[in-house]
Every structure is written in C-alpha cells, then in structure tokens.
Design a protein with these regions (language model features):
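Thiol-based oxidoreductase modules, predominantly thioredoxin-like and allied folds used
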Residues: 31-47
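Local sequence-structure signature of Cys/Sec-based thiol-disulfide redox active-site neighborhoods
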Residues: 1-35
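Amphipathic alpha-helical protein-protein interaction segments
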Residues: 10-13, 38-42, 79
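Thiol/disulfide oxidoreductase modules built on the thioredoxin-like
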Residues: 52-60
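Non-catalytic, surface beta->alpha helical segment in thiol-disulfide oxidoreductase systems
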Residues: 66-107, 111
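Beta-strand cores of modular interaction/reader domains in eukaryotic scaffold and signaling proteins
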Residues: 7-10, 35-38, 63-65, 70-71
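Short coil/turn segments at secondary-structure boundaries
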Residues: 20-22, 48, 67, 76-77
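Short amphipathic alpha-helices and their capping/turn residues within compact interaction modules
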Residues: 6, 19, 25, 29, ...
Length: 111
C-alpha cells in the first residue's frame, strides 16, 4: 500500500475544496503529491466523512490531513499560504514522508 503524507478530503462541487486543491496541487510542488479523495464520488464517502469528523473534530470539507493530522479546510490552507507558512507546516508535520515542498513560482525564480 502506498503511503501519502498529504490527503485532501474534498467534494467535487465545493468551492472551498476547489480553492484548497488549487493551492496545494497547482501553486506548490509537493513530493510525493497530495492524494485527493472526492467524498461525493467515493463509494464510502459518507462513512469516511463521519470517520473524519470523529477523528479530527471536523466534518466539513475540505479537510486536509498531513500525516493524519488535520490542518483545516479551505480558509486555513489559504491563510497558511498567504502568511507564507504552508510549506513549513507541511514539512514540519510531514517529517520524513515529505521529500519536497516549494512554491512553483519561487522555483521558477530560482532557476
């Protein structure tokens, strides 16, 4: 079984989920890449959402987990990004499971 340090629990139609996915998947280069679980398209979506609520105290989506710890939802991911704290948060919580995290625009500037 493949271990993924960053998992985004989402619903395909949710604007907050779209924003979090856009930041994590398009704005950042994260290795290994985050795994997205679309709860509205998953056969066990309702059960997973209930389990997330029980384990993280958060029933709403998106719910972004790093090594099993919730860092919050769309507003939280946006705030971490705007404060330039998202990469360090992912690295700190991801530990040995996160090989690389950087903003794609910063990577281009460095080249």
């Amino acid at each position: 079984m493949l271990y993924c340090a960053v998992v985004i629990f989402s619903k395909s139609y949710c604007p907050y989920s779209k924003r979090a996915k856009s930041i994590l998947l398009e704005k950042y280069n994260i290795v290994p890449a985050p795994h997205v679980v679309e709860l509205d398209q998953h056969a066990m979506g309702q059960q997973l959402q209930s389990l997330l609520a029980k384990n993280t105290g958060r029933r709403t989506v998106p719910n972004v987990l790093v090594n099993g710890k919730s860092i919050g939802g769309g507003d939280d991911v946006t705030a971490l990004d705007e404060k330039d704290e998202l990469a360090s948060t992912l690295k700190n919580l991801g530990g040995k499971w996160i090989q690389e995290v950087n903003r794609k625009d910063q990577k281009k500037q460095a080249e």
